[in-house]
From Swiss-Prot:
Origin superkingdom: Bacteria
PANTHER family documented for this protein: GLYCERATE KINASE
Catalytic activity: (R)-glycerate + NAD(+) = 3-hydroxypyruvate + NADH + H(+); (R)-glycerate + NADP(+) = 3-hydroxypyruvate + NADPH + H(+)
Organism of this sequence: Agrobacterium vitis (Rhizobium vitis)
A GO molecular-function annotation: hydroxypyruvate reductase (NADPH) activity
SUPFAM superfamilies registered for this protein in UniProt: GckA/TtuD-like
Name under which the protein is recorded: Putative hydroxypyruvate reductase
Length: 385
């Protein structure tokens, strides 16, 4: 074997790199990975770059330059190990020709506020990038590329995780245009020009990568179910790929929880209803509220339950950051709404203003873990007594 080059992008990439550096201590390797600020883990032989998430910054571009430089001019006997996890879309940025970092920031902000699913956002991002949608693997040719993936997307499609820098793109320019039109996205002129002219064309050729899934939402839910069963609870996994507006999903789950509590359907307590996936929050331009999709889901769930006895719930992002706040998520119980009102918070008003973080902070029911150094999407647990 020739050279071994380690590259990566995502909230878990530094932790993955440190583990690989330790396990392969007898292999001559080098490389560079990028992770979110505050998520770095020391690695002796692999350079760690920190950048901004969910909106990219100068270091996101610097990371792309360094990673592209690391894989250029490799030969057929060389091996590239790509460590990919959620968050890589904003951490690894190489704007399409004619676009700037400012353009990419504007695109990301428009996507994040639109209510689009993660799959839809990534379909647009791939068409505006010189590195996403398999282009990084093309740049590494003819070296062998092995991609180790931690999934944070519904359905675990590796082409969607971090916008698939080393995985063939199965979406098209027409898909991206349709998404922009459907969500009425206002994109900068340079991005509009790229889409109008057929998308980024930085690389051509077949994408070749051996992809291995090493962690996923379904694995996390299975582990949670095992812990629940060991503690005398009947676990029911409702799905690992749930999507939709956070407040709408919260309302639906309130109905499911009430059915379980009062009728024993789909399960009789003591039990726990588990689910994963990634909801979304559509934000009006003038929104000043604070909160992420997990706290908004929980506030909607609490309003739907309206103080029902014997039901508690927790929802959080497994990376430790719900949206852009310092909390992973929050938790609720039968007295949550009463405690909010006692603290001067009107729950329905807070939900309408997308201010769920403030509501849960007022009653000290935020869940704060700090960076977990992994990312397998959100996890929701509703306990039925």
């Amino acid at each position: 074997m020739g050279r071994c080059v380690v590259i990566g992008a995502g909230k878990a990439s530094a932790a993955m790199a440190a583990a690989l550096d330790t396990v392969w201590s007898d292999v001559d390797l080098s490389g560079v990975v990028v992770t979110r600020y505050g998520h770095a883990v020391p690695s002796g032989r692999i350079r760690i770059i920190e950048a901004s998430h969910p909106v990219p910054d100068d270091m996101s571009v610097e990371a792309a330059v360094r990673i592209i430089g690391a894989v250029r001019d490799l030969g057929p006997d060389d091996l590239v190990i790509a460590l990919i996890s959620g968050g890589g879309s904003s951490l690894l940025v190489s704007p399409a020709a004619g676009m700037t970092l400012a353009d990419k920031k504007a695109v990301n902000k428009a996507l994040l506020a639109s209510g689009a699913t993660i799959s839809e956002m990534n379909a647009v991002r791939k068409q505006l990038s010189g590195i996403k949608g398999g282009r990084l693997a093309q740049l590494a040719h003819p070296a062998r590329v092995v991609t180790l993936v931690i999934s944070d997307v519904p359905g675990d499609d590796p082409s969607e995780i971090a916008s698939g820098p080393t995985v063939a793109n199965d979406t098209t320019i027409d898909d991206a245009r349709e998404i922009v039109s459907r969500y009425r996205l206002v994109l900068p002129p340079a991005a509009q020009d790229v889409l109008a002219n057929g998308g980024a064309r930085n690389c051509t050729g077949k994408v070749s990568s051996d992809v291995r899934m090493i962690a996923s939402p379904s694995m996390a839910l299975d582990a949670a179910a095992a812990v629940a069963a060991a503690n005398g609870l009947t676990p029911v996994i409702l799905g690992d790929a749930l999507q939709g507006e956070a407040r709408d999903v919260g309302t639906v789950f309130a109905g499911i929880a009430m059915s379980a509590s009062t009728k024993g359907l789909p399960v009789r307590g003591p039990a726990v209803l588990l689910s994963g996936g990634e909801t979304s929050v559509s934000l009006p331009a003038d929104t000043k509220g604070r909160g992420g999709r997990n706290s908004e889901f929980l506030l909607s769930l609490a309003i739907g339950l309206d103080g029902a006895k014997g039901i508690w719930a927790l929802s959080g992002d497994t990376d430790g950051i719900d949206g852009i706040e310092d909390a992973a998520g929050a938790m609720i119980g039968p007295d949550s709404l009463a405690r909010m009102r006692g603290s001067g918070i009107d729950p329905r008003s807070a939900l309408s203003r997308h201010d769920s973080y403030t509501a849960f902070k007022a009653i000290d029911d935020l869940v704060i873990t700090g960076p977990t150094l992994t990312n397998v999407n959100d996890i929701r647990a509703i306990l039925i007594g």
